[in-house]
Amino acid sequence: MAAAETGRRPHIPVLLRPLLAAVAPVSGVWLDGTFGAGGYARGLLEAGADRVIGVDRDPLALEMAQDWAGAYGDRLRLVAGTFSQLDVHAGEPLDGVVLDLGVSSMQLDQADRGFSFQKDGPLDMRMSQQGESAADLVNEASEETLADILYHYGEERASRRIARAIVEARAAGPITRTLHLAEIVARCLPRPKPGQMHPATRSFQAIRIAVNAEFSELVEGLEAAERALKPGGRLAVVTFHSLEDRIVKRFLQLRSGGEGQGNRYAPETRAEAARFTLPLRRAISPDEAELADNPRARSARLRVGVRTDAPAGPVDPQVLGMPLIPKKGRR
């Protein structure tokens, strides 16, 4: 969940202080692959980075940054694009890469972006504002494909029940609003107890991941970071749910010479030269003070790797435990 600003006061990025501590000393050229409202980029510049390249696929994020980015002069360069191509966007070896995954607070808080199940808006969910929207997917995908997306990308146990309800609802007319979809999902699940998450949480996560191809983007981004980082360069990744954290954890384990497989069905892997070392024994989570200030940070996890001089190479997404959903066409 990339950090953002709400318009009332600056929102401090999740895990910023522990991230800066974990990658210290900060110097040279860094790339923030999920620029958002620029919180990490500013943190890196203030911590000592000579220059920061800010990459974001959301044109609105880069547009909003124009109000303050000029104050940093040529120390901050903004690029419209995806972090899966971060090595191309950088155009030079990097001393560090930061990735803050998922949807931003800014995107969640703007109802017209269609990410929120608590605010009525068009069923969109496109980070780049281009390509297939959530409404396209929900109204055109087959029931089987919808069920697979909900189960594999949202870990939703009631995936088949929800997919059936969506298909039945769209038969009466297109599903085009966020609250309409949230209501359909909620009717399929027990009423949550106080303090429990909204019943549409997992379904909205799954559809968003599918619309934005977030898992393939993540795997390609990790490979791109490996190619771009200098020996000694730092890779810091903040995740917000178990599926993406599993991919990052497995990538760093494999690339640091760790053994074992992501799951028993994954192909066997042979030992290779370590491309990263791991300065942290385990992932870092927000402390109580940060959670009190930002409850959305509860599921955040920070993982860090330090690049070695071993040559970069491709990685098999299946070995990383990336869910693969076969294309089954439209209804």
UniProtKB/Swiss-Prot annotation:
> What catalytic activity is recorded?
cytidine(1402) in 16S rRNA + S-adenosyl-L-methionine = N(4)-methylcytidine(1402) in 16S rRNA + S-adenosyl-L-homocysteine + H(+)
Q: Which EC number(s) are documented for this chain?
A: 2.1.1.199
What are the GO cellular component annotations? cytoplasm
Which CDD domains does the protein's record reference?
Answer: AdoMet_MTases (cd02440)
Instruction: For this UniProt record, give its keywords in alphabetical order, as a comma-separated list.
Output: Cytoplasm, Methyltransferase, rRNA processing, S-adenosyl-L-methionine, Transferase
Record region (Disordered): 308-331
Which N-terminal residues, if any, form the signal peptide?
A: none
Give a GO biological-process term: rRNA base methylation
| UniProt binding sites for S-adenosyl-L-methionine | G38, G39, Y40, D56, F83, D100, Q107
Q: What does this protein do?
A: Specifically methylates the N4 position of cytidine in position 1402 (C1402) of 16S rRNA.
- Note the PANTHER family from the entry: 12S RRNA N4-METHYLCYTIDINE METHYLTRANSFERASE, S-ADENOSYL-METHYLTRANSFERASE MRAW
The entry sums up its family as follows:
Belongs to the methyltransferase superfamily. RsmH family.
Designated name of the protein:
Ribosomal RNA small subunit methyltransferase H
What is the native source organism of this protein?
Answer: Cereibacter sphaeroides (strain ATCC 17025 / ATH 2.4.3) (Rhodobacter sphaeroides)
